[in-house]
Amino acid sequence: MSEYLVQFNNISKFFGKVIALKDVTMKLKRGEIMCLLGDNGAGKSTLIKTLAGVHKPDEGEIIFEDKKIIFDSPRDALDIGIGTVYQDLALVSLMSVTRNFFMGREPQKGLPLFKTFDIEKANKIAAERMGQIGIDVRDPSQAVGTMSGGERQCLAISRAIYFGAKVLAVSYTHLTLPTNREV
């Protein structure tokens, strides 16, 4: 087994005549933190979107847990454990912390034909998981729109980790996360 969780081998991505990525090679170990720095238009977001299954590379290969992978959709990336938190966070301001945390993957209770959303369990999990990364959510039914930008980004990160992200690509953390936050 390789020491690397993710490997990009000579990845290139083109949009018409625009070269977005050219021969990018990088390796990421389990537990490693990597920061991509570059000017606007340097390809950082394209690289993240390629890892997340939004874009298919035109050249090169992606190796994840020693297997060559080809994503047909972002769902494929999620299914193997690649989570992504984008700058816009994909949160709904008018919905609660709990609803945003589970969005489409709500815990259920009841009989097989009569299942309902287990709000008590969901509230408990959302509050606990947010607490684990230093965000005190006194009322998980509060609207996400009442939270700061950093708290919202922590919610999106916490959600990705809870649902099994082995790799977490986070775009523009410096815009909203406090510098003393540990995840």
Please place each PLM-identified region on the residue numbering.
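The feature captures the beta-strand-to-loop junction immediately N-terminal to the Walker
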Residues: L37-D39
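Conserved ABC transporter NBD signature motif
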Residues: G60-I70, D76-I80
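Conserved ABC nucleotide-binding domain
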Residues: R129-G145
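Conserved small/polar residues in nucleotide/adenosyl-binding loops
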Residues: T173-T179
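Helix-to-loop junction immediately C-terminal to a conserved catalytic motif
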Residues: A52
